[in-house]
């Protein structure tokens, strides 16, 4: 009961609960599963626009819930090619976000979120997915269209009749001093306050290594290789076991994980080329509680989870 309360009511991650009780993360997952089976915890998954949350009643989604403790989402059939699959993922994610009917939305970055943004831009009328929209991370370099957070927010806000909030910083500061100066700016304070009030966060689940590499060598040195990073959520890198890799020289500017944990709906979105290890690793962190992903990625991630616990 205490484990279930910490996870579902206090929004603690499975890794945090494991640390509190001195048990393994798989044991926490097992206890949460038993709580559902015994009726201690009841989770209702409704279609977009119904009840409080979205879901598809898909057996693969059920497997993700059993394996990783997520609350809902959608598993998307693979198309004849990656482009078709990514379009289907973007369309499904839009329906899910609209079905949540929440006010304050935070947007990550990446190619699949860029596809979603382009889908919104092409729509005939407004796509209502939130009343206020802000970026979750600073802006990428020139020429990286899908990693320019303010542009993604601008387009989405314009075509959803939402109020935008922008961040006037790069995705990564060059030094600790520059990071501190950035965090002292009025604009950063406004964005931080927007992060504190979020109802929904849409985050890209990416691979490691990746292109672009997000200045990973400057931020982490050899840590990502030594600690065997497999994936990424926003600009945080994770291991297959679900641990976020930390570095004293990581000066990334993005929503702090302690604020992300408090967001009611954290929707992780995967493209056709997301590696199953990346999805599994990110879900094991406990920060993502809704997922939109292609079926082949989901099925392989579930199998990896079974292999890890054999």
Q: Which positions does each model-derived feature cover?
A:
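Key DNA-contact positions within bacterial/archaeal DNA-binding proteins
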Residues: 26
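Gly/Ser/Thr-rich active-site loops/lids in small-molecule metabolic enzymes
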Residues: 214-244
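Gly/Ser/Thr-rich loops at beta-strand to alpha-helix junctions
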Residues: 105-115, 141, 207-209, 272-274
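Ligand-binding beta-strand-loop-alpha-helix segment within the catalytic cores
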Residues: 58-95, 99-102, 126-209, 216-217, ...
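Short, amphipathic alpha-helical "recognition" segments used to contact nucleic acids or chromatin
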Residues: 1-12, 36-39
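Short Lys/Arg-enriched helix C-cap and helix-to-coil transition segments
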Residues: 39-53
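Short alpha-helical "recognition helix" segments of helix-turn-helix
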Residues: 3, 13-23
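ATP/nucleoside-binding phosphotransfer catalytic cores, i.e., glycine-rich phosphate-binding loops
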Residues: 6, 30, 243-310
